[in-house]
């Protein structure tokens, strides 16, 4: 429970400090391999999207591999790390930045992006719903 605050931003009514996904500038994603026309398989990343804890850290399996004495387990850790690295490389090449604690979370144009990229300002603020309900 103590780790939850590291991964989910609480609701914040301050338009100057919106949670990243509410700006439309953040995306959670993984990689898949195409097996056949219309058939895909998710690549193993070592944890599910939204996992809480050390498993979610982008370089977690690199560190685990470095400390692992079992060659087979080490290869598994390196495979997970390689998949995470491939995702990061593709997204960074497209101008996104990665959340420091989540292998799956990338941003472009929000406050996280401005902080990690050194941009002076974010491009996007909070998007408020305009959908009316009865």
State where each predicted segment sits:
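Terminus-proximal functional modules
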Residues: 131-133
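Cell-envelope/glycan interface and biosynthesis
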Residues: 1-129
